[in-house]
Amino acid sequence: MEFPGGNDNYLTITGPSHPFLSGAETFHTPSLGDEEFEIPPISLDSDPSLAVSDVVGHFDDLADPSSSQDGSFSAQYGVQTLDMPVGMTHGLMEQGGGLLSGGLTMDLDHSIGTQYSANPPVTIDVPMTDMTSGLMGHSQLTTIDQSELSSQLGLSLGGGTILPPAQSPEDRLSTTPSPTSSLHEDGVEDFRRQLPSQKTVVVEAGKKQKAPKKRKKKDPNEPQKPVSAYALFFRDTQAAIKGQNPNATFGEVSKIVASMWDSLGEEQKQVYKRKTEAAKKEYLKALAAYKDNQECQATVETVELDPAPPSQTPSPPPMATVDPASPAPASIEPPALSPSIVVNSTLSSYVANQASSGAGGQPNITKLIITKQMLPSSITMSQGGMVTVIPATVVTSRGLQLGQTSTATIQPSQQAQIVTRSVLQAAAAAAAAASMQLPPPRLQPPPLQQMPQPPTQQQVTILQQPPPLQAMQQPPPQKVRINLQQQPPPLQIKSVPLPTLKMQTTLVPPTVESSPERPMNNSPEAHTVEAPSPETICEMITDVVPEVESPSQMDVELVSGSPVALSPQPRCVRSGCENPPIVSKDWDNEYCSNECVVKHCRDVFLAWVASRNSNTVVFVK
């Protein structure tokens, strides 16, 4: 509202529930003329943390009763009360009780004088996190004075200081004087002095954050620069001068050496100069070698990309035959280790070269670096933060190599199986014709790569996973000695997996021993993890053989073929028997006697019982 001109103006505030004045009471206000102040609107989002009682409590100690002309009024009503409907709901606004009842709001187009209080401006720091983007200014907090709150929010003020509108915290620093009174100007000046000092502190703190550059520590292995010819002469003569004059200072010794150098003949000087030149040449050579060594060390520290392939044993190209009852071979993906495992991009060029060479040829070994955080907690290694996976040109049923798809993200949703170091012996043509065969390119896994082990024993690890095989850490079952000179009759191995999914890293593998002449075994093997050294890198060397994903079980039929005998002379199939087999149609020319047939069958049965005890059911036909 506008007040008419005059020196004595009275503002009557009416309202049945006003906490300060009744309708008959008035208070005196000085005239400010007809000046009008434009108060800019302020848009605030709803903030449930701003309650009316909190804001009122903030101003409990801000009233100055001593500066008021009406002592009784200031003593009784000195507390500034603020109604803050900052976009709040009606229910929250009613928490203020009588402060909001009766429609008691002021439209303050004129500033009420500072006769009742000489306090500096009251500021409210509003966090900018929930504000609209329009209020995001130069600083994290916005300062709002009472006049803005009173005009925008309809505040009831009990004699508090009213300031001219402030558009921003920076505008408050301008030199324009306030039109109210000298007391008000003093308060604003004090407020002005405080703000630049605060800004200066912030700037100084920002400058102090810059850490001084640290000097590089000199490498003790770095070759030292050669000294000059004069320095060589100084070294030679200093000891002699010190011996003659023990009390001579360094400056005196230097003067004596300088005079001796000047009086030295040119030929003697050339001797020292030649020594210096030779030392420079040696220094340059040593420096070049030192730099090369530093670069090599930096390359080794990042990733060692030169794998050491284990010893390889030649084996015939195996052929896996799938039982017709099982579904068609599905795509086989690496095991789901994490929601997304992206292989290091440094292998992309290497992958491109492998893709051009195709599936044929000698497979190369690729290292895939997978961080420890990407692996589930059940298979994290206790020795380090990195797990190095070395698949040897993995061939899946899609006909793709894992090395070629290493730049793609491994999908975690599909459960898949990696069978490592499993060599399925060649199947006979007659038996293979009755079963569904996989295409030849997908049936060529790399040659058997064996771990460095005694030739008489091969470790087999079987992991249990819902659809396929997976490693379970069970106590090793009874050792079964099988001496295969030729392949036994076809075995059908049916794996009935457990309902629970477990992957463990400390492997206690069941052991199947074969004869020294036949170190190869025909049992599928999974996830052989080796820890060659106590370093922080573990290596998993995996050879993936295509397999069939079946909802309940997986049938792998091993059909006897024509294996490559490692010994020049065929021997009996039974483990431990060194006799040559006799010709017999019933035994397929594999046994030397009926006793060996019975013992071999007993060993196979015991192996089946042991595997059943370790939660792997193997049916032997």
Curated annotation (Swiss-Prot):
Residues 510-525 have a biased composition (Polar residues). InterPro entries: HMG_box_dom, HMG_box_dom_sf, TOX_HMG-box_domain. A motif (Nuclear localization signal) lies at residues 213-218. SMART domains: HMG. Residues 320-333 have a biased composition (Low complexity). In liver, recruited to target gene promoters following treatment with dexamethasone and cAMP. Binding is decreased in presence of insulin. The keyword Metal-binding does not apply. Expressed in liver (at protein level). Keywords: Chromosome, DNA-binding, Methylation, Nucleus, Phosphoprotein, Transcription, Transcription regulation. Component of the PNUTS-PP1 phosphatase complex, composed of PPP1R10/PNUTS, TOX4, WDR82 and PPP1CA or PPP1CB or PPP1CC. Interacts with PPP1R10/PNUTS. Interacts with FOXO1 and CREB1 (increased by cAMP); FOXO1 and CREB1 are required for full induction of TOX4-dependent activity and the interactions are inhibited by insulin. This is TOX high mobility group box family member 4. It comes from Homo sapiens (Human).
